[in-house]
């Protein structure tokens, strides 16, 4: 079947719907629904990338300059991530996403007001007179507390204090080490002697 014959068959079956001709657009049944008032317009453009080339997204930098999104370079984004202590690897979109989320989180944190309890101010009208007796009594009490706290701490015994003698496995290890070092020491002079061949 040729394309022109196929086009005639389709045009006869769907009245009011034009068939595809070479170089012409194809009208499908759902296009009639879209032509009704109140229907949404649908554009059938194929985008190569998921992001548009021009974006009107603005971003607030550290120095409070609003810079357009398309003027950012990867180097600038990495410097901004480094200054904020964020991860430096990834694509440009990843870096932007990290910066935007970090700034939005930091703006939320800064907008939250922390209620600190008010400190009570003590007004002293009469200064306190300190005598030598008060000072000496105070130092004696602190020394007494320190000594009692030292006496209350448990004494931890180390393994050397508990077992002053060698364990059987320690004796076997030391004996084996001593024997190997003696054998090695005896073999060393025999290797260094020159041999005379007749």
Curated annotation (Swiss-Prot):
It is found in: Mitochondrion membrane. SUPFAM superfamilies: SAP domain. Residues 69-103 form the SAP domain. It is a single-pass membrane protein. Keywords: Membrane, Mitochondrion, Transit peptide, Transmembrane, Transmembrane helix. Belongs to the AIM34 family. This is Altered inheritance of mitochondria protein 34, mitochondrial. It comes from Saccharomyces cerevisiae (strain ATCC 204508 / S288c) (Baker's yeast). The gene is AIM34.
């Amino acid at each position: 079947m040729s394309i022109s014959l196929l086009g005639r068959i389709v045009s006869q079956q769907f009245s009011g719907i034009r068939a595809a001709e070479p170089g012409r657009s194809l009208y499908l049944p759902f296009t009639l629904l879209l032509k009704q008032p109140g229907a949404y317009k649908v554009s059938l453009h194929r985008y190569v990338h998921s992001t548009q080339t021009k974006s009107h997204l603005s971003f607030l930098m550290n120095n409070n300059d609003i810079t357009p999104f398309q003027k950012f370079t990867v180097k600038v984004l990495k410097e901004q991530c480094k200054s904020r202590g964020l991860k430096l690897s990834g694509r440009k979109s990843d870096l932007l996403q990290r910066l935007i989320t970090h700034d939005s989180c930091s703006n939320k944190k800064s907008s939250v007001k922390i209620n600190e309890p008010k400190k009570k101010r003590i007004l002293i009208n009469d200064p306190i007179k300190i005598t030598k007796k008060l000072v000496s009594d105070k130092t004696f009490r602190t020394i007494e507390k320190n000594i009692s706290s030292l006496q209350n701490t448990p004494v931890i015994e180390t393994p050397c204090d508990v077992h002053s003698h060698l364990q059987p496995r320690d004796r076997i290890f030391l004996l084996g080490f001593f024997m190997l070092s003696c054998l090695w020491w005896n073999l060393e002079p025999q290797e260094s002697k020159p041999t005379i061949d007749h």
